[in-house]
């Protein structure tokens, strides 16, 4: 059962592009060479993955990005179909008590993660660089400040990625595709937490 569309999609997209948070993130993308990649900050992820066809109409279905009993809400997503990074305010500030500075810091870290997916999709990471990063995430242990459980279990960024993304195998992708996702997610998390 799809949710009834309760938002004005075009309006939400425009607000997501022009919010004070998005403007700060835009500066980061520009500085990192991703001037053509869009960024939208909204309550929910508004990417093509949450749009479904129902009875010949396009419907908004945020169920796959919202928090469940097993998993937290999706914080961000790079949509390669539209070349836009979508970030969720509901995921970074679920109780509504964070200050603007705290929200911006959280969004910046998520942007760092999602930028890796954009760089990879645009083939802006060379094979040598990717091979280096792949080896790095398979050998670098996760710091305690990033994930206490991963630290206790002496996980690398790669083994942590396999654990926290274990549901990927059920989606029907080939073993090679799932492995690539594990590696790319590990690299994205390494970049996100590089200052820890």
Regions found by a protein language model. Name each.
Residues 5-196:
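Active-site-flanking segments in enzyme catalytic domains
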Residues 1-2:
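Intrinsically disordered, low-structural-confidence terminal and linker regions
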